[in-house]
Amino acid sequence: DIYKYSLTFLAERRNARLDKYMTKINSEFHKLLQEQIGLELVSSNQYLAMSIHYDNLDMPQMTDVFKGHADEEYDHAMQMIHYLQDAGIKPEVPEIPAVRNDFDGFVEPVRVAFEHEQFVTSKIEKLARVARDSYDFSGESFITKFIDEQVEEEAYFSRLLAIVEEEGATVFEIENWVAREI
């Protein structure tokens, strides 16, 4: 049918135009940023799994905290994808490994999240170092907001971990603290 043929033809022309202008990843910074996209998507999925865990524990405040973080990590991946596209680089969505779905109680997911944020911080800092060392000023400028974000994330999860690890902390107390602080 002519309509289907026209759509296929237009899509092929658009892809050919994009391929003409979009280059493959061409620097260490861009390669690391591509990897970071994958890590942000893994983070999003991991926080979604944690949100489900808290939902199963009937902890709506904690459920919302981790659902919000899942959305935020996905947004970070999209910002990185758009940055690469704006730089004329064709990003690819990497394979995303499975995430952990089983946790014990209400402390373990927060501990895992805090450790994960520390790991993400190390990756973001490496991106900043590589951008600076290669005089990639736009890359350094772009990644700076993520450095600031990581300071906030680590501080937040550190405080949350202190609350959930407090001896005798109850679900009610944790939920109330989260409701007040968020």
Predicted regions and their residues:
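Iron-associated oxidoreductase/ferritin-like identity signal
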Residues: 2-182
